[in-house]
From Swiss-Prot:
InterPro entries linked to this entry: Mechanosensitive_channel_CS, MS_channel, MSC/AndL, MscL_channel
UniProt subunit comment: Homopentamer.
Database matches in NCBIfam families: mscL
Keywords assigned: Cell membrane, Ion channel, Ion transport, Membrane, Transmembrane, Transmembrane helix, Transport
Ion transport is among the record's keywords: yes
Protein name: Large-conductance mechanosensitive channel
Organism placement in taxonomy: Bacteria, Bacillati, Actinomycetota, Actinomycetes, Micrococcales
Entry membrane topology: Multi-pass membrane protein
Subcellular location: Cell membrane
SUPFAM superfamilies: Gated mechanosensitive channel
GO annotation, cellular component aspect: plasma membrane
Length: 133
């Protein structure tokens, strides 16, 4: 039982996933710091407030606690867009470049798909069954 658990944990996918989660958490901290300490102060210089949280806040009814906070939504949306852009330009673009260089080195052309081995095997089985009948 312990051997099976050890084999499961040491599989490449589980280890890769664990590394990705740790690196993702660290990267999230870096991007959050970028947004909170660099980008939002720049926006505060333009808008006049450190975030949009209080910019478009509308009270609904007579209860002061009942507010529609459009500015808070815009702040979160802006944070999301900045984080997505940072991930795209700092992770996706370099990885695509590395993959393209590796494919060029191996002689794999862009758009050229290698067939799935399972599909190839199933095609061979189908052809063998056709030739029998």
């Amino acid at each position: 039982m312990i051997k099976g658990f050890r084999d499961f944990i040491l599989k490449g996918n589980v280890v890769d996933l664990a590394v990705a989660v740790v690196i993702g958490a660290a990267f999230g901290t870096v991007v959050t710091t970028l947004v909170n300490n660099i980008i939002m102060p720049l926006i505060a210089g333009i808008v006049g407030k450190p975030s949009f949280n209080d910019v478009w806040a509308f009270q609904i009814g007579s209860d002061p606690a009942n507010k529609l906070l459009l500015g808070a939504f815009i702040t979160v949306l802006l944070n999301f867009v900045i984080i997505a852009a940072a991930i795209y330009f700092m992770v996706v673009v370099p990885m695509n470049h590395v993959i393209a260089r590796r494919n060029a080195k191996l002689g794999i052309k862009a758009g050229e798909e290698t067939p799935d081995p399972q599909i190839v095997l199933l095609t061979e089985i189908r052809d063998a069954l056709k030739s029998r009948s």
